[in-house]
Swiss-Prot record:
It is an enzyme of class 2 (transferase). It catalyses: [(1->4)-alpha-D-glucosyl](n) + ADP-alpha-D-glucose = [(1->4)-alpha-D-glucosyl](n+1) + ADP + H(+). Pathway: Glycan biosynthesis; glycogen biosynthesis. Belongs to the glycosyltransferase 1 family. Bacterial/plant glycogen synthase subfamily. InterPro entries: Glyco_trans_1, GS/SS, Starch_synth_cat_dom. GO terms for molecular function: alpha-1,4-glucan glucosyltransferase (ADP-glucose donor) activity; alpha-1,4-glucan glucosyltransferase (UDP-glucose donor) activity. Synthesizes alpha-1,4-glucan chains using ADP-glucose. The gene is glgA. ADP-alpha-D-glucose binds at residue 15. This is Glycogen synthase. Its EC number is 2.4.1.21. The lineage of its organism: Bacteria, Bacillati, Bacillota, Bacilli, Lactobacillales. It comes from Streptococcus agalactiae serotype III (strain NEM316).
Length: 476
């Protein structure tokens, strides 16, 4: 099968979040299964700085962005049997960052037009065209309303993945003519209109053959007013083509048996190295060395979305318990201040590291006993999967991808891979922590069984890849 991904970012070239991870991993997994896979993304200045000497200049052409006749440079690099095509235009993409400019609408309108015209130029007409988030959300619409006259494009099937429904691409309706060069009929009849704006994401939901998001529970949640960010009605209307597929993690890179960031390696059948990592981390961060004290790890952005309001509300209570806690991350200033204050008040119990350090993050996953992640909402989440891979049991709010990946401890049969609570409040977070501490302190065999079960879970991209492959095959 010929599959083309079009996205605004992709690891290792340019990455700001989970979308970059997906574009770095999913095409590679599909290629391993024998599919012909290409990725199209912008050629940012940071790509040129890091990879410019490896990338081949292929061709150039011009595209019309409304009245603007714009240069489209095409560069190419093959990596892991995936061919990356980069759209080069220094005016649009040499900004020192990926997103956040006043003219993002024009930048990504240009990118989508260039990507669609590129297919014919490189003679790669995909069976499936997979686009991601609002930056590429107009492609299914353009394919059917602007480029339908190109016969070779008529059999292309489209998949749109929502990584973050919050950013929908809402712009003035004049953009249809001014940038995309199409009439306003689909805006006037309401198809593309939302809150008196042109809404790119709404266009993708209506025009794509399939819509996916990054976990089954989140796919259900975005059909509700609480999580749908205004598009819940459209999601319910198009529910028949909506599904959720959990993202994977790189299980080769994230491996406690080989991780180069760890002082000691370990496996699910021999956890001695995990205990040594705990003692090493305690020493490194100035906490009393004690292999028996339950160590709680947090690696996160410090925001309300990640549940730090309820953590902060119970932090004093938590630190009254016989625990140690290590926090790593940056975010809202008041949360940074709160954790710094409590670290000075409880220096033998709390280490607050208000920074981001990849090496320390890996060491926290490996050393901690409990990984706290009570997000208010979480489309997928990777940290809980990484924690389980390293034998740290997640304590999560049952929402989105957390609900789909963490199996709550069952005290009757010992099943589970972590601990969870349903009602989003500090009280239930605290009650669930007390349960986890009781199991850790009083039932060590049950705890070891939970660790074994967590470390046995397969969250690799190979598993996620099978689900995408089945989805693509349904479209043929």
């Amino acid at each position: 099968m010929k599959i083309m991904f079009v996205a605004a970012e992709g690891a290792p070239f340019a990455k700001t979040g989970g979308l970059g991870d997906v574009i770095g991993a999913l095409p590679k997994s599909l290629s391993k299964k024998g599919h012909d896979v290409v990725v199209v993304m912008p050629y940012y200045d940071m790509v040129d700085q890091k990879f410019g000497d490896q990338i081949e200049n292929l061709m150039y052409f011009y595209t019309d962005v409304g009245w603007r006749h714009q240069y489209v440079g095409v560069k190419r690099l093959s990596q892991d049997n995936v061919t990356f095509y980069f759209i080069d235009n220094q005016y649009y993409f040499y900004r020192g960052h990926v997103y956040g400019d006043w003219d993002d609408g024009e930048r990504f309108a240009y990118f989508q037009l260039a990507a669609l015209e590129l297919m014919e130029k490189i003679n790669f007409i995909p069976d499936v065209l997979h686009v991601h988030d609002y930056h590429t959300a107009m492609i299914p619409f353009l394919l059917k309303e602007k480029y339908h006259w190109i016969q070779a494009y008529n059999n292309i099937r489209t998949v749109f993945t929502i990584h973050n429904i919050e950013f929908q691409g809402q712009f003035g309706p004049e953009m249809l003519g001014d940038l995309f060069g199409v009439g306003a009929e689909r805006y006037e009849d309401g198809t593309l209109r939302w809150n008196n704006c042109l809404n790119w994401m709404k266009a993708a939901i209506l025009y794509s053959d399939r819509v996916t998001t990054v976990s089954p529970s989140y796919a259900n949640e975005i059909k509700t007013p609480e999580f749908g960010k205004g598009l819940d009605q459209i999601m319910r209307m198009e529910a028949g083509k909506l599904s959720g597929i959990v993202n994977g993690i790189d299980s080769d890179l994230l491996n406690p048996e080989t991780d180069a960031f760890l002082p000691y390696h370990f496996s699910k059948s021999n956890l001695e190295g995990k205990i040594k990592n705990k003692l090493a981390l305690q020493e490194n961060l100035g906490l009393p060395q004690d292999k028996n004290v339950p160590l709680i790890g947090i690696v996160s952005r410090l925001t309300d979305q990640k549940g730090f309001d309820i953590i902060a509300s119970e932090l004093d209570n938590m630190l009254q318990q016989d625990i140690q806690m290590v926090i790593l991350g940056t975010g809202y200033h008041h949360f940074e201040e709160t954790f710094s204050y409590f670290a000075s008040r409880y220096p033998e119990k709390l280490s607050a590291n208000i920074t981001f350090d990849l090496r320390l993050a890996q060491q926290i996953y490996a050393a901690s006993d409990i990984f706290m992640m009570p997000s208010a909402f979480e489309p997928c989440g990777l940290s809980q999967m990484m924690a389980m891979r390293y034998g740290s049991l997640p304590l999560v709010h049952e929402v989105g991808g957390l609900k789909d990946t963490v199996v709550a401890f069952n005290q009757f049969d010992g099943s589970g891979t972590g601990f969870s609570f349903n009602h989003f409040s500090g009280y239930w977070l605290m009650q669930t922590l007390k349960l986890a501490l009781e199991v850790y302190n009083d039932y060590p065999e049950a705890w070891k069984k939970l660790q074994w079960q967590a470390m046995s879970k397969d969250f690799s991209w190979d598993t996620a890849c099978v689900a995408y492959e089945q989805l693509y095959q349904q479209l043929q």
